[in-house]
Swiss-Prot record:
Belongs to the sugar phosphate cyclases superfamily. Dehydroquinate synthase family. This is 3-dehydroquinate synthase. CDD domains: DHQS (cd08195). Keywords: Amino-acid biosynthesis, Aromatic amino acid biosynthesis, Cobalt, Cytoplasm, Lyase, Metal-binding, NAD, Nucleotide-binding, Zinc. Zn(2+) binds at E177, H240, H257. Its EC number is 4.2.3.4. It comes from the Bacteria. It is found in: Cytoplasm. Binds 1 divalent metal cation per subunit. Can use either Co(2+) or Zn(2+). NAD(+) binds at G98, V99, V100, G101, D102, T122, T123, K135, K144, T162, L163, D164, T165. HAMAP family: DHQ_synthase. The keyword Amino-acid biosynthesis applies. Coiled coil: none annotated.
Amino acid sequence: MEELTIDLKDKKYPIYIGYNILRRLIKEYWDKYSSSFLITHPFLREIYKEDLSIPEENVIYVPVGEKSKSFQEVIKISKELAKRMADRRSALFAFGGGVVGDLTGFIASIYMRGIKYIQIPTTLLSQVDSSIGGKTGINIREGKNLIGTFYHPDAVIIDIKTLDTLSEREYKSGIAEVIKYGMIMNYEFFKFLEKNVDSILSKDVDKLLYVIKESLLCKKYVVEKDEKESSLRMILNFGHTFGHAIEAKGGYRRFLHGEAVAIGMLLATYLGYKLGFCNYEVLERLKELLMLFGFKIKSPYRIEDLMEYIKRDKKAYGGKLRLILPREIGRVEIVEDIEEKDIIKILKEGDDYGK
């Protein structure tokens, strides 16, 4: 087992990474609080019943899917916590993917004005991205994660054994976020991914441990430098401005998050290439790597139809869009002065990279 530490001004917490570490670490943390509650999906509870020897009265279930990141679910779970006498010294254990983690973190941040929570991500996407850094949130019709808080967990427990039960589609979705780290700040890591596609797809344990740790080191560096996303942390949203728009346009049902981000990264890179920020090789290598991992690279939506969502992006201010565009593999730039009409014109021309 390896351990990293997120070290912030007002909070420090550990990230545990290993194989088959779940049972021991849950037992270690569960009794630290006045009462503990597991927030999870019914199917995960069933699969991990032996590892999670937790009484049913301490389990609260969440439906599968992005639709669960809603005010309705927040109220429902908060009422359950109140009925079960959760107090300010209680803790929530988020056992699931990004939906469970984002929802649980948000509830923990507002229930009784803040209680503790532990992240136990079970998808590759949540293990390398959403469980780290303290972002919580729920969706509304107008966009993804538009309601949320910055609220850090007490600990993050990453047991890569949980990836064994993921569907191939869910697993691949997480790989998009892994590729993102190579694109934004680690050229050597990007080359590693190019050379190890087959072993990563086959879930080779040693390769996976390396991929997850390297991804987390990238995110740790950025979060510690810019906790509240005032500047540097925005680079973690490479591909997400377009990706979130694609998710929202599809009603959060047609695309998984990573699938939408994969298309979003390619759209952003195509835009960067056409505007002279990066060369054609950057675009081609990203496209090739995404295709090797089995991602679709075309958006089914017209860029004009996505602009409604893009303009609500959380990085935007004063009506101005902020986009993260690549300079080269391993380096991106926050760009603020691109006109909406230019984005539409360029991406409409990109037959191979979006519609």
